[in-house]
UniProtKB/Swiss-Prot annotation:
GO terms for biological process: tail-anchored membrane protein insertion into ER membrane. This is ATPase GET3. Zn(2+) binds at C283, C286. GO terms for molecular function: ATP binding; ATP hydrolysis activity; metal ion binding. The active site is at D63. It comes from Ajellomyces capsulatus (strain NAm1 / WU24) (Darling's disease fungus).
Length: 341
């Protein structure tokens, strides 16, 4: 974050993410943007800040390129585990190449998990893996599990690059519609299918079609609940991360338009890797790059005057490990003040 006070007018919004910390109803926070703009660093840092004001925080990576382990210098897997040095911040990395059946079963008792025990065995797994973008399916299954357990007060998602993220957020709507259609078809053809299945010895596990359909209806209700939560600005928000370059700005604009069309709240943008060369600097490349960045920063200000725009400086070291992440996270809530230009 940065020289916001210098660049913006007095009527602009705070150039920090403090509003997210103050929003006590917030349950889902998605952090996303183009690849290579600092999403993971930003999501880890935001989770650290949230852990200071909330009882329990879970950080989930839905990016197949999992970087949480690298960022914290600690190995994470598909089970949530505490981040070293914290007693209320946990992290996990969903493996899109793992078995979806394993993921759906991790909730323990199948009776508590509407997606587990549908009685479809390998067919359910085949169906899941036939969906374009299985990582979205895996991630969404984890969301469903968290909705049912409610064991964390707030969940932060370090998302995959833009396209995957938007498909993931669209997933509940698509799935809800598909299950509604399936339910409609089953009510029409259920009796006939039951008689056919009865003649063939029934379904695996001794379940009948009605039991499976009732579990699918329960699943549809849960998905509907998730959908409603994602579209509730009191519960869900999306933090856009970008750098001050044309392609990143273009991607951010497209993402915000799509989020708006999905009715998902977004009002914060983090602009990373900003240069602030001093006025006596002899680095001509730095000055030229700063000039270009200023141009795109001005565009961001014009386009998103009702957003909290956070300006983060380019650092001389990688942000890895708890101490550096904490230092970086402080700049998300206390604006970085650059040297005079």
């Amino acid at each position: 974050m940065s020289s916001t006070a210098m660049v913006s007018g007095d009527d602009s919004l705070e150039p920090t993410l403090q509003s997210l910390l103050d929003q006590k109803t917030l349950r889902w926070v998605f952090v996303g943007g183009k690849g290579g703009v600092g999403k993971t660093t930003t999501s880890c840092s935001l989770a650290i800040q949230l852990a200071k004001v909330r009882k329990s925080v879970l950080l989930i990576s839905t990016d197949p390129a999992h970087n949480l382990s690298d960022a914290f210098g600690q190995k994470f897997g598909k089970e949530a585990r505490l981040v070293d040095g914290f007693d209320n911040l946990s992290a996990m990395e969903i493996d899109p190449n793992g078995s979806i059946q394993d993921l759906l079963a991790t909730g323990g008792d199948q009776a508590d998990d509407p997606m587990a025990g549908l009685g479809l065995g390998g067919m359910m797994q085949d169906l899941a893996f036939s969906i374009p973008g299985v990582d979205e399916a895996m991630s969404f299954a984890e969301v469903l599990k968290q909705v049912k357990s409610l064991s964390y007060e707030v969940i932060v998602f370090d998302t995959a690059p833009t396209g995957h993220t938007l498909r993931f957020l669209q997933f509940p709507t698509v799935l809800e519609k598909a299950l509604a259609k399936l339910s409609q078809l089953s009510s029409q053809f259920g009796p006939m299918l039951n008689s056919i299945l009865g003649a063939r010895g029934g379904l695996p596990g001794g379940q009948n079609l009605d039991e499976i359909l009732s579990k699918m209806e329960s699943l549809r209700e849960t998905i509907g609940e998730v959908n409603a939560q994602f579209k509730d600005a009191d519960l869900t928000t999306f933090v856009c991360v970008c750098i001050a370059e044309f392609l990143s700005l273009y991607e951010t604009e497209r993402m915000i338009q799509e989020l708006t069309s999905y009715q998902i709240d977004t009002h914060c943008i983090v602009v990373n890797q900003l240069l602030f060369p001093g006025k006596d600097s002899s680095c001509e490349q730095c000055k030229a790059r700063r000039k270009m960045q200023k141009k795109y920063l001005n565009e961001i200000e014009d386009l998103y005057e009702d957003f909290n725009v956070v300006r983060m400086p380019m650092l001389v070291e990688e942000v890895r490990g708890k101490e550096k992440l904490e230092k970086f996270s402080n700049m998300l809530v206390n604006p970085y003040v650059p040297p005079e230009e």
